UniProtKB/Swiss-Prot annotation:
Annotated gene: ndk
Catalytically driven reaction(s): a 2'-deoxyribonucleoside 5'-diphosphate + ATP = a 2'-deoxyribonucleoside 5'-triphosphate + ADP; a ribonucleoside 5'-diphosphate + ATP = a ribonucleoside 5'-triphosphate + ADP
EC number: 2.7.4.6
Protein name: Nucleoside diphosphate kinase
GO annotation (BP), single: CTP biosynthetic process
């Protein structure tokens, strides 16, 4: 089933020049970028995005971190996109993530963990409008007929 997922490359990914390498990994798995922005997340966006964590002790630090520098926000599309990206991302705690996953290869711990990915269709429905208008999602097809 084709579905969409929101992916954020967090400030540590941007500052460490990992954008291209991470997007390549996602595309190499057959996921298609249908929206992409390089942006500075506002405090309001961060608080809305992480609203499920509002009552947790780390909420304030999470908002401070995610707004500490630019991010890359993107919508990816493909078969089982949510599951595929979650597997590629690896464990939330980078120190426990398996080698070969994005966090396993690039993250040092749980706080600066490189990437966010929607964990369910419901999460995507909440998260996507924080970063994109529906009109910013681009429907397109691969040009395989031109290449092959």
């Amino acid at each position: 089933m084709t579905e969409r997922t929101l992916v954020l490359l967090k400030p540590d990914a941007v500052k460490r020049r990992l954008i291209g390498r991470i997007i390549s990994r996602l595309e190499d798995k057959g996921l298609k970028v249908v929206a992409l922005k390089f942006m500075q997340m506002t405090k309001d966006q961060a608080e809305n995005h992480y609203s499920v964590h509002r009552s947790k002790p780390f909420f304030k630090d999470l908002v401070t971190y995610i707004t500490s520098g630019p991010i890359v926000a993107m919508v990816l599309e493909g078969p089982k996109a949510i599951e595929v990206v979650r597997i590629l991302a690896g464990s939330t705690d980078g120190s426990k993530a398996q080698p070969g996953t994005i966090r396993g290869d690039f993250s040092m711990g749980i706080e600066k963990n490189i990437i966010h990915a929607s964990d369910s269709p419901e999460a995507y429905s909440h998260e996507m409008p924080i970063f994109f208008n529906e009109s910013e999602i681009v429907e397109w097809s691969y040009g395989d007929e031109i290449i092959y």
